[in-house]
Structures are given as structure tokens and as C-alpha cells.
Amino acid sequence: MKAIELIQSNVPPVRINEPIEKALNWMDEFKLNHIPVVNNTEYVGLLSDEMVYDYNNLSDSISKINFIGNQHFVLENTHFFQVVSFLSKFKLTIVPVCDDQKNYKGSISGKKLLDIFCGQSG
């Protein structure tokens, strides 16, 4: 099973020009510690709740946050077990999926990966 087949549509990315508060609200709503950030279709990086709390100004645009070192993603043809390994290695709650031009395709939550691993992918 490839990453592109595991994408969930219920967790939308936030846009680079949106307020940081919106990202934090979505993380809370979806019970995640990370959320993908995009600029149109281009993947920018993975915003963590820790980055938000360190920044400490929720009304600012997400574009004010430095994403260097937080650009974790897998390619769309990455195998399921490699996606699980990636999630574990970087201690993520969600894994962004991109094509080879870094266009954002969607994301896979840790819960979804665990459900599949346990055979409960319904």
C-alpha cells in the first residue's frame, strides 16, 4: 500500500497567509499536534503546536513562522511501512504526502496508520 492510497480528506491543510490561531484551532479540532501548511498547492512545512506556543502571537499570519527543519513529508509512492517508520522517527501525529515537485497531495494521520496496521481500516 502506497502513501497516496492512505490519504485522508478530513484533515485540511492551513494556508500560509491564514492566522496562526486558525491552525491551532484545527489542531485542537482534529486532535493533532501538527498540521500541514501550503502556499496554493506547494507544501511549505509542518506546523506544530510547540512552534505556535513558542511564537506566542496567535493573530499573526502563519507566514511569520520559520519552517526550516520542519518540512517533513513523504512522497506519494512511499510504502506503508516506510510511512509508519517516518511518523515514529519524527514523532509526528500526521504525515504530509507530496509529489516529487513538492506539491501537497494530502495527509495521513497516525490514527489512520495504526488502524490499518491493526487491520481495522474501515
Regions found by a protein language model. Name each.
Residues 6, 19, 36, 51-52, ...:
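Histidine- and aromatic-rich ligand-binding microenvironments
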